[in-house]
Amino acid sequence: PYRRQRQMCIRDRAKRSRILKPRFTVMAVHIGMTNIPYQSDLEYLKNYAEGLGVPFVYFETSFDLSTDTRKSPCFLCSWNRRKALFTVAKEHGCTKIALGHHMDDILETLLMNITFQGAFGTMPPRLVMRKFDMTIIRPMCLVHESDLSDMARVRGYRRQIKNCPYESQSNRSDMKEVLKSLEKLNPEARYSLWGSMTNIQEDLLPDKID
């Protein structure tokens, strides 16, 4: 429900680029997935972005849910949304794409990869996509989801008109509950999980079995 509000937080922070060096320019892009029955207030988003002096671009796309029944709707939507973002970025000469993922997103992805993929990895704060000559950055990677929710409430950001019907049916929503359970066991669990990503003790891990 707060995806749009994350975008607005990024735009608000981007406004501060006027006092930073090196100089850079930003544009806001909203990808509309026409085959998923959710609804955003596009006029509100456009007015908010342009009120900060940020150009707003709306790009529609869709995908066929039947193309790969092994993949969840959330995975297919995310993959096609990302592809559309690359298309728009290339068309407008952008070299970086700033995504609104926060710390909770990154830790939930880590837990999903461990649980379902048997891999220790997640979404990095910075990812150079050499194939596309593009860099993905996640400027809110250290921000808690609860802090963004508080900011959205204080600033009076509007929520989506209609949320995605698949929102509560994904592995991510399950991992969100797992993270909450871990924090009940240890209030500092999120920081331990984060620290584990840069504290790999290879000598204490089993060798790969072919």
Which role does the model predict for each range below?
Residues 25-29, 57, 135:
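A structural signal for isolated positions on well-ordered beta-strands in alpha/beta enzyme cores
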Residues 30-37, 165-169:
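Short histidine/acidic/glycine/proline-rich micro-motifs that form metal-
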Residues 43-68:
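A conserved beta-strand->alpha-helix junction
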Residues 75-147, 193:
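Active-site adenylate/phosphate-handling loop in enzymes that bind or generate adenylated species
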Residues 1-6, 10:
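Single conserved hydrophobic/aromatic residue that forms the stacking wall/gate
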Residues 121-124, 128-210:
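ATP/NTP-dependent adenylation/nucleotidyl-transfer catalytic domains that generate, transfer
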Residues 11, 39-46, 145, 149:
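Short, surface-exposed alpha-helical segments at coil->helix boundaries
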